[in-house]
Amino acid sequence: MSQENPLPLAAGLTAKTQQLCLGLEDGSADIYDLVTPTTAELLRWWFLEDICQTRRFNFHPGQRQAILNSIVAHEVLAAPTLQALYRQAAPDALLEGTTLREVASAKHAHPKYCLKMATGTGKTWVLQALLIWQLLNANAARAAVAVDPRFTRNFLIVAPGLIVYDRLLDAFCGKLQAGVRDFSTSDVARYAELFLPEGLRETVFGFVRGNVCAKDEIGLKATGNGLLAITNWHLLAEADEAVDEAGIEAPGAPLEPQQVIAGLLPLSPGRATGNSLEVLDRRYARGGVLDYLAGLTDLVVFNDEAHHIHEVKKEGETTEVEWQKSLSRIAEGKGRRFVQVDFSATPYNDVGAGKNKRKVFFPHIIVDFDLQAAMRAGLVKSLVLDRRKEIGALPLASTAERDEDGNPTLSEGQRVMLRAGFAKLKKLETDFATVDAEKHPKMLVVCEDTTVSPLVARFFADEFGLSDEEVMAVDSGKKAELGEKDWAPIRERLFDVDRHEKPRVIVSVLMLREGFDVNNICV
């Protein structure tokens, strides 16, 4: 891959897909004759102009291109490996540098796609659309008593952490209320008019309700006709294996006593050695999950936020270690019936250090909907610096100070910035009320640590008379204080905070990262 075109596969496949999809909106595109009747029905439902005009929601151009590129790569071109896909969509790229050697490696010896989409542009809807496409085609093949290796009813969705994991469960199973998930609040049910023709909805609803397995149910829960497993990547990664083991082997040399003990008792119990009962239980469970997934005849893995699990640093280099080992084990023996679909806004590894540091993009990127394109489409926010003459000349210290008794207190600069932000919030609340009364802007204050966040909350109460309901503190201290049971409702409220009038202000200590919907924050 050249520096001029670091994403040759995405460029080549997009050009081919756009050619095949000319006339997609009126039903005359060539692609309709190149796919199964099931896929053609879905494409018409998703993209025919007459149908799109009848509903409130539709896929935006970035989502549309991601879905179409995936279908062309997997169903139309039917490439069994990444190398085969390059030969059909970007053959010239194989002549550049080490591309051929890279894509011919064992870890790419199956269908493997990376969808590069900016954060906040609806990757989950693309994931759900592709899952539905796979499921319904697998159903059609089974009904015809046929085997089509391109399609499966077994799915594994991997999240980068617990917040996104919970969001994925919400998307498929519905919101958790009083310990029970309400399927009617799931994305699949709420946006059924987008995803599915009416005659196919109950089929998909039944599959989701009957086959979803949370991370502690994988391999244990009985599912009737497939699998929809959702987990965070830590359950599957070989995270306990040391990444950097420097040493010299000396056969025949006397062994140290601790080495003899380690040979006889490889696990030394105790938290200090990393072998608490909780850790040992997780290792045992992980082994069972990997064995179960490896035993499946076919599987599609949807990997959300893929950049998180490819990054393992060793001597200044970032390489694929932890996650790739597990994937290779699961994929073994499946051939083209193992499919990997990665979603990431930043699908690259940082290689080198200092002046030699550079980005090496994943070779399996098949679509590129980057941040600039998303901003031009109005799908993500752009930052605006609000210059104010009245505070421009003031020295604004952005960190807390201490009073005469050594207790932390807000600096005058912090107070000025909070006042300015709250003034902006009140203006936005007035403006929003005239445009969409059901959307409520919020003010987000990010503090340096948990000693400062209570000071900020108190400032809003004292300065502006805001109640506890109007100011929500979101940090590890608050979570520890409340406990998981009382914290869960707060976390759920954050997921759709812009639908509620209160809270007006959210005070955080860098907890709002992956999974927090940026559409909700306006100040």
Question: Where do the language-model regions lie?
Answer:
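RecA-like P-loop NTPase motor core of helicase/translocase proteins
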Residues: 1-523
